[in-house]
């Protein structure tokens, strides 16, 4: 394959993890994002400051499931969806929106221009109560500035919670929030 040829489109695929109880459909044409590619991408497009790089090293845990619209490395902001799982710990008993209220101020410290577009609110995902927030900021990668819209869902489930994040360009030129929403609509937590 030469650089001018597009990567072969991957077929749609249902991804199931019975151990943690989640199922989601990767759309046709989207790609699995490996843990290594995810970490490389975080380092490449994140702020160059020391605090961000330390946060990547500390919190850049590999997602349990991750999809991107384009094969990495990709020269622009690659629309993506990532699913992580975290222990509830001291957050036990809190709603998804309450957890978001705790998480977002830390994120705002990493991005000086971060703007909350949709404040944390309760919603439902895959039959589970969840919190949702949408925010925008600028990622910088070398000489590039990438105006970004991120969406974050927190789904509490017992002693842990799912953290589902998605990102697109603000102008949606190479991928849309509607595409992300179509993936979100396939998530299922009731696998029994």
Regions found by a protein language model. Give the residues of each.
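N-terminal targeting sequences that direct proteins away from the cytosol to non-cytosolic compartments
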Residues: 1-77, 87-89, 101-102, 106-128, ...
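Short histidine-centered catalytic/ligand-binding loop motif
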Residues: 84-96
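Beta-strand acidic-aromatic groove motif in beta-rich domains, primarily in extracellular
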Residues: 79-81
């Amino acid at each position: 394959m030469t650089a001018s040829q597009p990567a072969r489109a991957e077929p749609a695929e249902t991804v199931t993890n019975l151990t943690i109880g989640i199922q989601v459909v990767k759309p046709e044409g989207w790609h699995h994002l490996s843990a290594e590619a995810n970490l490389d991408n975080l380092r490449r497009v994140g702020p160059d400051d020391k605090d961000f790089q330390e946060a990547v090293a500390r919190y850049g845990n590999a997602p349990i499931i991750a999809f991107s619209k384009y094969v990495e490395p990709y020269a622009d902001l690659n629309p993506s969806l990532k699913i992580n799982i975290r222990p509830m710990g001291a957050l036990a008993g809190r709603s998804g929106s309450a957890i978001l209220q705790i998480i977002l101020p830390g994120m705002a410290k990493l991005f000086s221009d971060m703007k909350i577009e949709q404040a944390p609110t309760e919603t439902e995902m895959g039959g589970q109560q969840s919190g949702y927030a949408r925010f925008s900021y600028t990622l910088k990668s070398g000489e590039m500035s990438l105006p970004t819209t991120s969406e974050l869902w927190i789904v509490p489930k017992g002693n842990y919670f799912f953290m589902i994040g998605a990102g697109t360009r603000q102008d949606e030129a190479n991928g849309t929030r509607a595409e992300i929403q179509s993936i979100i609509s396939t998530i299922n937590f009731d696998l029994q």
